[in-house]
């Protein structure tokens, strides 16, 4: 039927309206049928049937963004297929959507999902994308076409946040022989995208913040690298046996053995690398961690946990006395709980304020790694028994008394689990041990387990961080963080 309509148009049969379509450059005149335009377009239906003077007029002039594309849309109302001989495909498809929207017609984003748009037209692409309910294909379209120097502040915040989520990746950083390895995670699998930072001496300890990597080597120095460029930005000449950033990266803490009988924890500002405080410890420091509010340092000395003021270096209290040597501790992100693992095979969750035990989990052998989930509801722990467990510790939770075994290490050379880290959103657990593998396990599964062979014999500590695999977004995020902007919440 619509083929006949197009024949009527070409021969000007039964036409009842002379239409002039104008843009900023020229005009096109067409003899058309009111009923066709009104049936296909709410714009024309309102204009030609409403209380406007065009209602009874035989001539109608409209001004559009592009006369050629408007003409093609009207011809398509008659059944002629859309085809483009005048413009680049990207321009035609974007303007086609804008013009259809102007005419009050249904618009569909599927035609632009695979478009390649030049950098000078990115603003137009953003305008068109904002006409739709945003979806993953449109986010991919924006990311794939993003120019290297584009001002991302021009993109609506909700759309920009989705672009950030789309490009956000988790990375694992680990010490290797005379180098630092960085590998990208794709789900629970390790990709082939790897970077290395060469070091003169093999790294002993490694820690990562949102913008820095700190490494201590056997040569007696702490080397600081930019996470953006992977270039060395500072060197601290001190012999360090343990090293860690605070959770927000504001401070770098180093355990320094000043003599055979003297140990201290030095707190450095991560921007200036000036010493903020110095905590003298009378005994050996097994392990330490910080509260996420940067108020306290928790130090495990053999069988007890001491609490120190991070800013002043003053002793606060002793809590968490265990029966045997404490091998690992962690603090929940809400600063309410402390977890410890010891040589007795006990994983204990403590109430930080009262010092009372919230929950105790018993294993058959030593515990060497503990880690709270980001939601502060579960604790992951592992050690010499070749098992990594994830358990609810809240007494009100129905699963609090059930051990959930994430994975049992069947590899014959696995003996210990030394370090545990969660990726963003608690979706994956990454751990290392006394072997040359780093393992990633998807939370909630048993079989989704992947290994990264690092060729290293023992990896005692690893780092996990999130970054963006689009350079424009990555640079913008880091600039905003440096300005302490409140704009971005991702």
From Swiss-Prot:
The keyword Manganese does not apply. InterPro entries: BTB/POZ_dom (IPR000210), SKP1/BTB/POZ_sf (IPR011333), WD40/YVTN_repeat-like_dom_sf (IPR015943), WD40_repeat_CS (IPR019775), WD40_repeat_dom_sf (IPR036322), WD40_rpt (IPR001680), WD_repeat_multifunction (IPR051179). Pfam families: BTB (PF00651), WD40 (PF00400). The keyword Mitochondrion does not apply. Keywords: Repeat, WD repeat. WD repeats lie at residues 196-235, 237-274, 280-318, 321-362, 364-403, 412-451. Residues 15-91 form the BTB domain. SMART domains: WD40. CDD domains: BTB_POZ_ZBTB_KLHL-like (cd18186). PANTHER family: ANGIO-ASSOCIATED MIGRATORY CELL PROTEIN, MITOCHONDRIAL DIVISION PROTEIN 1-RELATED. Belongs to the mimivirus BTB/WD family. This is Putative BTB/POZ domain and WD-repeat protein R739. It comes from Acanthamoeba polyphaga mimivirus.
């Amino acid at each position: 039927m619509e083929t006949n309509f197009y024949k009527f148009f070409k021969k000007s049969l039964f036409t009842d309206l002379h239409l002039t379509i104008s843009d900023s450059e020229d005009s096109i005149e067409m003899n058309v049928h009111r009923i066709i335009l009104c049936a296909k377009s709410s714009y024309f239906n309102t204009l030609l049937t409403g209380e406007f003077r065009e209602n009874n007029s035989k001539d109608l002039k409209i001004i559009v963004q592009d006369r050629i594309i408007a003409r093609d849309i009207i011809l398509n109302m008659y059944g002629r297929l859309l085809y483009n001989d005048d413009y680049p495909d990207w321009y035609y498809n974007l303007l086609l959507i804008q013009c259809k929207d102007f005419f009050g017609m249904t618009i569909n984003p599927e035609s632009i999902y695979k478009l390649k748009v030049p950098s000078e037209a990115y603003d137009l692409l953003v305008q068109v994308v904002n006409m739709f309910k945003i979806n993953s294909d449109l986010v991919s379209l924006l990311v794939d076409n993003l120019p290297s120097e584009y001002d991302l502040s021009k993109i609506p915040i909700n759309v920009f946040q989705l672009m950030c989520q789309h490009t956000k990746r988790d990375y694992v950083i680990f010490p290797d022989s005379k180098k630092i390895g960085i590998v990208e995670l794709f789900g629970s699998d390790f990709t082939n995208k790897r970077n290395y930072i060469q070091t003169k001496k093999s790294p002993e300890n490694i820690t990562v913040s949102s913008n820095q990597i700190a490494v201590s080597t056997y040569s007696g120095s702490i080397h600081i690298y930019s996470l953006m460029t992977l270039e060395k930005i500072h060197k601290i000449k001190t012999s360090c046996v343990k090293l860690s950033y605070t959770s927000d990266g504001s401070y770098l803490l180093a355990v320094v053995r000043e003599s055979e009988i003297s140990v201290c924890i030095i707190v450095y500002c991560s921007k200036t690398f000036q010493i903020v405080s110095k905590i003298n410890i009378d005994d050996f420091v097994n392990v330490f961690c910080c509260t996420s509010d940067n108020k306290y340092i928790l130090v495990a000395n053999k069988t007890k946990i001491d609490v120190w003021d991070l800013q002043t270096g003053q002793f606060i209290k002793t809590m968490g006395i265990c029966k045997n040597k404490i091998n690992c501790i962690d603090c929940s992100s809400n600063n309410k709980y402390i977890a410890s693992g010891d040589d007795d095979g006990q994983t204990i969750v403590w109430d930080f304020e009262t010092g009372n035990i919230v929950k105790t989990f018993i294993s058959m052998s030593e515990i060497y790694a503990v880690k709270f989930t980001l939601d502060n509801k579960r604790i992951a722990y592992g050690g010499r028994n070749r098992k990594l467990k994830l358990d609810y510790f809240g007494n009100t939770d129905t699963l609090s008394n059930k051990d959930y075994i994430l994975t049992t290490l069947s590899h014959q050379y696995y003996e210990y689990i030394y370090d545990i880290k969660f990726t963003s959103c608690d979706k994956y657990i990454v751990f290392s041990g006394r072997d040359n593998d780093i393992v990633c396990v998807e939370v909630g599964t048993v079989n989704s387990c992947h290994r990264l062979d690092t060729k290293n014999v023992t990896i005692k500590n690893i780092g996990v961080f999130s970054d963006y695999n689009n350079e424009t977004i990555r640079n913008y995020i880091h600039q905003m963080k440096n300005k302490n902007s409140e704009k971005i919440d991702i």
